Amino acid sequence: MRQTPLWAENWPIAYSVIQAIVILLVVVLVAALMSFIERRLLAWWQDRYGPNRVGPGGMFQIVADMLKIMFKEDWTPKFADKLTFRMAPAVAMATAVLSFIVIPVSPTLGVADMSIGLLFFMAMAGIAVYAVLFGGWASNNKYSLLGGLRSAAQTISYEVFLGISLMGVVAIAGSFNLREIVEAQRDMWFIVPQFLGFMIFVVAGVAVTHRHPFDQPEAEQELAEGYHVEYGGMKWGMFFVAEYVNIVLISALIVTLFFGGWLAPFNLEIPFIPPVFWFIVKTAFFVMMFVLARGALMRPRYDQVMNFGWKVCLPLALVNLMVTGAVILMNQA
């Protein structure tokens, strides 16, 4: 059962606003910090130096990068559709940040306790497709357009598998509410009965975030950064931060849906460790896995990505859903 501070019961709107500001600020700051963490981890795994010039150990590199982006010229191509061109990064950033309001970080910490939390996430993921379409088309650049079309086709395709892979979890928990899904995992995390759904969700999540090895929409060697090739300054920075926000979002959803959210391993009760600690540790692990995938895996061809989705992920997701439904019906009988 959700517990809130006594003052929050008298001031529910103020409490929700404070939670929203705190969580969203933390998410954006962590997403910005991730660029530094990714560069350091990749350098460590590849046995080379990462950023090490700005501050002790290069720890102020992210500050230097942010200042550089903020003071770059805010340029719009002459032949671009200016309104749509400016709208695209705002849509990308807004959908990424808004998706976080349904994530329960602890039993008491969360912006919105929606009964349709998962459906809200899927809705935001669907709207996010328009950001790359707007950016690709409005730039009036062939590389941008190709990147935008690739991104739209890939994202819409893998969102189908993403949604179907979630239905097994919803069927077991009996709810679309993420807080209730976490509470349903007190006896056993859903990674055990839904391992196949977990694998499909991870693959689809990486594809939806356009991260390596599914980064064909931004393939530097083929499309010169894809749909945001014409963007610079803060507009490009919003696309950049939105990508890392999505990484944290997918990692947080993996933890919430399959690894018990804020619940301690083996249902341990350790009084001096707050529930939010377990949520942060689990999420950080999967964020590191995103970075490791970039350093370890090759990029397949675009047709291979689409074939893998429709010929492998979709059948497996449907099998997982049917088997889960059959097991639930047999248990009820």
Swiss-Prot record:
Enzyme type, top EC level: translocase
Domain of life of the native organism: Bacteria
Catalytic activity field: a quinone + NADH + 5 H(+)(in) = a quinol + NAD(+) + 4 H(+)(out)
A molecular-function term among this protein's GO annotations: NADH dehydrogenase activity
GO BP term, example: aerobic respiration
Compartments where found: Cell inner membrane
E.C. numbers: 7.1.1.-
Gene Ontology annotations for the cellular component aspect, listed alphabetically: plasma membrane
Main localisation: membrane
Membrane topology, from the record: Multi-pass membrane protein
InterPro entries cross-referenced by the UniProt entry: NADH_UbQ_OxRdtase_su1/FPO, NADH_UbQ_OxRdtase_su1_CS
Membrane-spanning residues: 17-37, 91-111, 116-136, 156-176, 188-208, 244-264, 272-292, 310-330
Keywords from the named record: Cell inner membrane, Cell membrane, Membrane, NAD, Quinone, Translocase, Transmembrane, Transmembrane helix, Ubiquinone
Pfam name, any one: NADHdh
Subunit relationships: NDH-1 is composed of 14 different subunits. Subunits NuoA, H, J, K, L, M, N constitute the membrane sector of the complex.
Function: NDH-1 shuttles electrons from NADH, via FMN and iron-sulfur (Fe-S) centers, to quinones in the respiratory chain. The immediate electron acceptor for the enzyme in this species is believed to be ubiquinone. Couples the redox reaction to proton translocation (for every two electrons transferred, four hydrogen ions are translocated across the cytoplasmic membrane), and thus conserves the redox energy in a proton gradient. This subunit may bind ubiquinone.
Family: Belongs to the complex I subunit 1 family.
HAMAP family registered for this protein in UniProt: NDH1_NuoH
Name of the protein this chain belongs to: NADH-quinone oxidoreductase subunit H
